Amino acid sequence: MIGLRPAFSTMLFLLLLTGGVYPLLTTALGQWWFPWQANGSLIHKDNVIRGSALIGQSFTAAGYFHGRPSATADTPYNPLASGGSNLAASNPELDAQIQARVAALRAANPQASSAVPVELATASASGLDNNLTPGAAAWQIPRVAAARQLPVEQVAQLVAEYTHRPLARFLGQPVVNIVELNLALDALQGHRAK
């Protein structure tokens, strides 16, 4: 019985430390130092949560920039079902999906003369990606400008304005957050696109 007391005391101490003190401390520090990130990087417009800067949304109207395809089953951009399609590059089903996406993108973007950007035809590993390269966003500018009856230059300027560059140039590539960009388009015109 004497040998159990130190083991039980150690277990109780570690349980309180790792199950109570550590989670409370990390939560408090996160809320103190990084409150926006710790609360999900939520985007607020007119005191309403419009989305998260970390999770993509399904934009299908011609007046919006479209993000990467979602690989989440049943409901696009479902954060509870995050994950890729798990189809191998050699799988004919993946090839058929990509070909169908390319055909749909070409039909929706008849003004685009260059090749369809890869990230518009392929889903990300999480299936929830909210960022595109500036090139993939630029590829969609003619469609969005025509649908919103805006000058192409004005939409291109908005894409440039919402292009986020990495802190150090060698640590990544510039990206455009599609959720933020589409909300900025709505704010520019004062309404939602049809």
UniProtKB/Swiss-Prot annotation:
Q: Which Pfam families match?
A: KdpC
Q: Where in the cell is it found?
A: Cell inner membrane
Location (main, coarse): membrane
Q: One cellular component GO annotation, for this chain's record?
A: plasma membrane
**Organism (species):** Salmonella typhimurium (strain LT2 / SGSC1412 / ATCC 700720)
Complex and partners: The system is composed of three essential subunits: KdpA, KdpB and KdpC.
InterPro entries listed in its UniProt record: KdpC
Q: Which GO terms describe its biological process?
A: potassium ion transmembrane transport
- Please explain the role this protein plays, according to its UniProt record: Part of the high-affinity ATP-driven potassium transport (or Kdp) system, which catalyzes the hydrolysis of ATP coupled with the electrogenic transport of potassium into the cytoplasm. This subunit acts as a catalytic chaperone that increases the ATP-binding affinity of the ATP-hydrolyzing subunit KdpB by the formation of a transient KdpB/KdpC/ATP ternary complex.
Any idea what this protein is called?
Potassium-transporting ATPase KdpC subunit
- Write down the membrane topology: Single-pass membrane protein
Which key words are in the record? Answer: ATP-binding, Cell inner membrane, Cell membrane, Ion transport, Membrane, Nucleotide-binding, Potassium, Potassium transport, Transmembrane, Transmembrane helix, Transport
Q: Where do the TM regions start and end?
A: 12-34
Q: Does the keyword Transmembrane apply?
A: yes
Q: Does the keyword Ion transport apply?
A: yes
Q: Which family, according to UniProt? A: Belongs to the KdpC family.
